[in-house]
């Protein structure tokens, strides 16, 4: 987190003598801060353990989530407890040498969390707008290099300026006695805020807005493909059925409505993600710049805005997996749930594309069997096996019992935009119906 600016120069506090007095904050404030700290540490630890223990979640995209949850976990374990004591007592009550170290970790962990959010948006952007080239571009070594680059930038924006004293340039006033508030100059605040917040937030807005536009545009395309090629899908799967024009028309309308709801859900998802990010962090960084200019923000208000930014580390492990179907399923397997055995038995008993000896298998959807035409600027040229075809035909992938893939299959351009956070696919599952025995 960018240190609080102000006209005072030195970041080395003057320490009062004697033991610390009783905390000035109320019991409700202390209890609320303890709940925030416990929830932040528990939620991020749970999701890190979930990704590490569940093979279905070990893929390149979730590597960025592990980095995000690690930075948020460090905020909850390293940054929040001293900040709580500092807010309750009104002064720094820990060892004097820990003040500068804690401030550096504060800046590094919060900056790393914001930069990891930027990497996640970039990963979603590449996956949805260029799905055929995603695995060629976002390889595990490149993902690791991006994560290391984010943490290196966060460390350079925190430890290096504090150790070299760049934040003290141009100041000569003594510090406030007993306080651990890093007072920085306006140039340092502008540079640090731009590198760790304004540039990443601009990239996040750009990528998510592009995803939103693609979701709205391609939801209409998916609905038209679903309506126009339902009969072709039936012939591809060789599922005989009796034509019912009235029922098919109603089904087409329901499918179009469902696609519209999926696009709306994608829009709401983006709104929630962007809204929570800017609500928690934008007030703090605006207050940083205002304080550097006029020194007119009280310490109490600045503490409130600081904790509002900390709460972003509490919300990230709740908001992001909330829209990811794989996390929900893995969490149901990871945590004991009384309803899980009954739901699993009901799922096994339901008629679908299964045999009596093969176990549960994934159902076929329209996106797996329909030739989906790609726009002219698509990445169809990267498909070496297409043979110059203008469409992309994805066949159903049937897994053997107990077989699992480490990375999810590449989504098509039409379905990925609506399903950019692993929302349940919009296409109906096609199930074969047994043929009746002919009678004379």
From Swiss-Prot:
- Biased region (Low complexity) positions are 362-371
Membrane spanning stretches:
28-52, 63-88, 97-122, 143-167, 186-209, 267-293, 300-323
Locations listed in the record: Cell membrane
Q: Which residues are involved in binding serotonin?
A: 106, 288
Q: Does the keyword Membrane apply?
A: yes
Supply the Pfam families for this chain. 7tm_1
Q: Which GO terms describe its biological process?
A: adenylate cyclase-activating serotonin receptor signaling pathway; adenylate cyclase-modulating G protein-coupled receptor signaling pathway; cerebral cortex cell migration; chemical synaptic transmission; G protein-coupled receptor signaling pathway, coupled to cyclic nucleotide second messenger; positive regulation of TOR signaling
Q: Which SMART domains match?
A: 7TM_GPCR_Srsx
Entry's free-text remark on domains: Specificity for G(s) G alpha proteins is determined by the length of transmembrane regions 5 and 6 (TM5 and TM6).
The molecular function terms in GO held by this entry are: G protein-coupled serotonin receptor activity; neurotransmitter receptor activity; serotonin receptor activity
UniProt name for this protein: 5-hydroxytryptamine receptor 6
Question: Function of this protein?
Answer: G-protein coupled receptor for 5-hydroxytryptamine (serotonin), a biogenic hormone that functions as a neurotransmitter, a hormone and a mitogen. Also has a high affinity for tricyclic psychotropic drugs. Ligand binding causes a conformation change that triggers signaling via guanine nucleotide-binding proteins (G proteins) and modulates the activity of downstream effectors. HTR6 is coupled to G(s) G alpha proteins and mediates activation of adenylate cyclase activity. Controls pyramidal neurons migration during corticogenesis, through the regulation of CDK5 activity.
Q: How does it sit in the membrane?
A: Multi-pass membrane protein
Q: Which residues are exposed on the Extracellular face of the membrane?
A: 1-27, 89-96, 168-185, 294-299
The protein's matches in PANTHER family, at most eight in alphabetical order, are given as: 5-HYDROXYTRYPTAMINE RECEPTOR, 5-HYDROXYTRYPTAMINE RECEPTOR 6
């Amino acid at each position: 987190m960018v240190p609080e600016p102000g006209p005072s120069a030195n970041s080395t506090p003057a320490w009062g003598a004697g033991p610390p007095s009783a905390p000035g904050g109320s019991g409700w404030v202390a209890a609320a801060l303890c709940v925030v700290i416990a929830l932040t540490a528990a939620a991020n630890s749970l999701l890190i353990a979930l990704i590490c223990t569940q093979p279905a979640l070990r893929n390149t995209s979730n590597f960025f989530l592990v980095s995000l949850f690690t930075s948020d976990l460090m905020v909850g374990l390293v940054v929040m407890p001293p900040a709580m004591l500092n807010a309750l007592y009104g002064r720094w009550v820990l060892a004097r040498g820990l003040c500068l170290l804690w401030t550096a970790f504060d800046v590094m962990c919060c900056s790393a969390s914001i930069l990891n959010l930027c990497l996640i948006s970039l990963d979603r952007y590449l996956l949805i707008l260029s799905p055929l080239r995603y695995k060629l571009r976002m390889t595990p070594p490149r993902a690791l290099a991006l994560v290391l680059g984010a943490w290196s930038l966060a460390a350079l924006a925190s430890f290096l300026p504090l150790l070299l004293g760049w934040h003290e340039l141009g100041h000569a006033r003594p510090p406030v006695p007993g306080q651990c508030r890093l007072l920085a100059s306006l140039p340092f605040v502008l540079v640090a805020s731009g590198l760790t917040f304004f540039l990443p937030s601009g990239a996040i807005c750009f990528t998510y807005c592009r995803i939103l536009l693609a979701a709205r545009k391609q939801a209409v395309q998916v609905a038209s493909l679903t309506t126009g090629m339902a009969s072709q899908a039936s012939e591809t799967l060789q599922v005989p059925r009796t034509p019912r024009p009235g029922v098919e028309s109603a089904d087409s309308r329901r499918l179009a409505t469902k696609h519209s709801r999926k696009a709306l859900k994608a829009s709401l998802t983006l709104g929630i993600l962007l809204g929570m990010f800017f609500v928690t962090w934008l007030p703090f960084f605006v207050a940083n710049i205002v304080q550097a200019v006029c020194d007119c923000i009280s310490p109490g208000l600045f503490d409130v805005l600081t904790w509002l930014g900390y709460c972003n580390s509490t919300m990230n492990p709740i908001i992001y997996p909330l829209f990811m179907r794989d996390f929900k399923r893995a969490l149901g397997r990871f945590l004991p749930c009384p309803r899980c055995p009954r739901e699993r038995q009901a799922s096994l008993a339901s008629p679908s594309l299964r045999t009596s000896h093969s176990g549960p298998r994934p159902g076929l959807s329209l996106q797996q069997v329909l030739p989906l035409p790609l726009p002219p600027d698509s990445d169809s040229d990267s498909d070496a096996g297409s043979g110059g075809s203008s469409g992309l035909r994805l066949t159903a992938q049937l897994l053997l019992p107990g077989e699992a893939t480490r990375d999810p299959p590449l989504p098509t351009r039409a379905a990925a935009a609506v399903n950019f956070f692993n929302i349940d696919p919009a296409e109906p599952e096609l199930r074969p119906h047994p043929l009746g025995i002919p009678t004379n």
